[in-house]
Amino acid sequence: MASMQQTPALFRPIKVGRITLRHRVVLAPLTRFRAYASHVPGPQQASYYSQRGSVPGSLLITEATFISHDAGGYGHVPGIYTDAQIQAWKTVRVVSFVSPGLSYTCLMVCL
């Protein structure tokens, strides 16, 4: 019989590739339509991800991000295909990495 003191699996560490997560709760991609009209992520994305990545060993998967202009189809969804978009994502990453969580980008194609 399991001890009542045993940590539930959800809150136990797990190794995913080279990364060890401190728990198994992952922020799934939530496309929030908050980028600028030019599909450039703004400061609100940096704030959003740094808040949610504040617990060490957390994993965040960013909102859906267009890989090209032709792959898009929705307004205010961030892209990662122009210099301005890439620079903005770098800013988001710098702010996010001040927090101890990990993040990956969810790439999206709408055809």
Q: Which role does the model predict for each range below?
A:
Residues M1-L111:
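Flavin-dependent oxidoreductase catalytic cores
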